[in-house]
């Protein structure tokens, strides 16, 4: 399973690249989508590689992401009880394992918002106009995407930047 994060905005972008980002549901900076790895997805990612970063997400990071940032329609949090009713999985860990192993697609879960909103990363991005291979942020980063996602999930802070009580 691939985690894809948009790191650059819309200004000065070619229309076909913007359309591809729209098809991937990456319309805003710091939005994340979870995609299955196939030839079509890889081709689309190569087209928008200067505006996004992606890599393989692991079970631990996906579990934290589902607990803290995944929402149902209407901006409701995903609780353990609703998780069991909607997906049939008893815990976040079981759902994360099934998603990573490809047993279920994230888009097949009913009433879940397909885009996950994140905070900007703690300590910031590296150079966003430079590829990850050359010391920047854009493009394919493999397993290192997990470190970036963990820096973007700030514990105790909701989606509006306010401390949760």
Curated annotation (Swiss-Prot):
InterPro entries: Ribo_uL30_ferredoxin-like_sf (IPR036919), Ribosomal_uL30 (IPR039699), Ribosomal_uL30_arc (IPR005997), Ribosomal_uL30_euk_arc (IPR035808), Ribosomal_uL30_ferredoxin-like (IPR016082). One of its GO terms (cellular component) is cytosolic large ribosomal subunit. Pfam families: Ribosomal_L30. CDD domains: Ribosomal_L7_archeal_euk (cd01657). It comes from the Archaea. Keywords: Ribonucleoprotein, Ribosomal protein. One of its GO terms (biological process) is translation. Gene3D superfamilies: 1.10.15.30, Ribosomal protein L30, ferredoxin-like fold domain. SUPFAM superfamilies: Ribosomal protein L30p/L7e. GO terms for molecular function: RNA binding; structural constituent of ribosome. Coiled coil: none annotated. Belongs to the universal ribosomal protein uL30 family. Part of the 50S ribosomal subunit. This is Large ribosomal subunit protein uL30. The gene is rpl30.
